[in-house]
């Protein structure tokens, strides 16, 4: 039954992804960014709805009042595809740091490109860091939030990746606060797995973390400790009660 429900979800997901990609291309030269963001992120909301209908995956938010701080740098745990879609509209308008290869994905990549992301070339890490900081500060000055997954890539549930300091560096340079986001989406929507598991994803949003006079190394460590600490306290997301224990990468 889980395979069938996951298949139906994937079918709707892929068809709707193609549709919103075409819409994004059509409206790109016509509508201003604020309207493009509203239209394109309707797809993100649809995915949340479709996930609930097909796979029985819901979510609850703790600390939602802290999401009203604009502009800010959002630093979130990266376990799944789920958070990339949820956070995109929840903290919007938001510019996301992502690998440029995503733009090559037909339809989906087109929709992404219309939302002012910051695309980086991971084959040239030094130049990528410079571009992240330069464009990140520009987006914040334009009034956008900036979303960063400090671990750089998805980490399987139960693992703790290395937290990069670029998010803290940008926030300090731009003089904006950091909002940390902890969640356990990977338990219901595991990375690189087709099957989706019914349950309730917990999303915990921190109070604004002020950056004035802070050191980026310590600030990054504080964010990491907060995120991983909140995840450790969460009850299992899946209805079957499966919960993994975090293992930090060395």
Regions found by a protein language model. Name each.
Residues 62, 98-99, 120-122, 150, ...:
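Thr-Gly-centered strand-to-loop micro-motif
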Residues 61, 74, 96-97, 203-205:
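Generic preference for hydrophobic
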Residues 47-71, 246:
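A short, well-structured juxtamembrane/interface segment
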Residues 21-41, 52-54, 68-125:
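Catalytic core of membrane glycerolipid acyltransferases/transacylases, capturing the structured
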Residues 3-4, 129-250:
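Non-catalytic C-terminal accessory region of glycerolipid acyltransferases
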Residues 4-30:
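A hydrophobic membrane-anchoring feature enriched in long, contiguous, low-charge segments
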């Amino acid at each position: 039954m889980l395979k069938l429900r996951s298949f139906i979800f994937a079918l709707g997901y892929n068809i709707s992804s193609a549709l919103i990609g075409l819409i994004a291309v059509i409206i790109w030269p016509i509508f201003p960014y604020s309207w493009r963001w509203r239209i394109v992120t309707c797809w993100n909301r649809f995915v949340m709805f479709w996930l609930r209908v097909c796979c029985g995956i819901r979510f609850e938010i703790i600390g939602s009042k802290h999401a009203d701080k604009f502009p800010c740098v959002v630093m979130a745990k990266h376990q799944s595809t789920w958070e990339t879609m949820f956070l995109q509209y929840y903290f919007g308008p938001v510019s996301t740091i992502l690998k440029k290869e995503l733009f090559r994905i037909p339809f989906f990549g087109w929709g992404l490109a219309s939302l002012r992301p910051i695309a980086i070339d991971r084959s040239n890490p030094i130049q990528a860091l410079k571009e992240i900081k330069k464009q990140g500060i520009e987006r914040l000055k334009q009034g956008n939030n900036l979303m960063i997954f400090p671990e750089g890539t998805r980490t399987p549930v139960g693992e703790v990746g290395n937290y990069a300091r670029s998010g803290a560096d940008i926030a300090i340079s731009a003089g904006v606060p950091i909002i940390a986001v902890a969640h356990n989406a990977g338990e219901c929507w595991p990375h690189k797995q087709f099957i989706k598991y019914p349950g309730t994803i917990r999303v915990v949003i921190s109070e604004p973390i002020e950056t004035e006079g802070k050191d980026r190394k310590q600030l990054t460590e504080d964010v990491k400790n907060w995120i991983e600490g909140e995840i450790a306290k969460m009850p299992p997301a899946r209805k079957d009660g499966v919960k993994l224990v975090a293992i930090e990468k060395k």
